[in-house]
């Protein structure tokens, strides 16, 4: 299965780039798995929640997401180099 890597805009206006997997869940439970999410800040990518945890996978509720989009090719390339 190919990785689905997207730019994610959260309701707090934080922009992430991450592999994302939709998970079947009960109403109110987290239903998206973010794998190796990174915060996009101008031209810098920083692992999400870097100062708080060593985890690289996070569960999030889709109601915390405003929109999901395909990353520009240069951003995708930068992200892939960073995580590999």
Please provide the spans of the model-predicted regions.
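Conserved RNA-binding domains used in RNP assembly and mRNA/RNA metabolism
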Residues: 1-84
């Amino acid at each position: 299965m190919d990785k689905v890597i997207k730019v994610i805009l959260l309701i707090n206006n934080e922009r992430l780039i991450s592999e994302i997997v939709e998970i079947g869940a009960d109403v109110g439970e987290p239903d998206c798995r973010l794998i190796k999410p990174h915060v996009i800040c101008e031209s810098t990518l920083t692992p999400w929640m870097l100062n708080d945890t060593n985890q690289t996978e996070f569960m999030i509720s889709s109601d915390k997401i405003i929109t999901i989009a395909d990353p520009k090719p240069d951003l995708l390339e930068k992200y892939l180099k960073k995580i590999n």
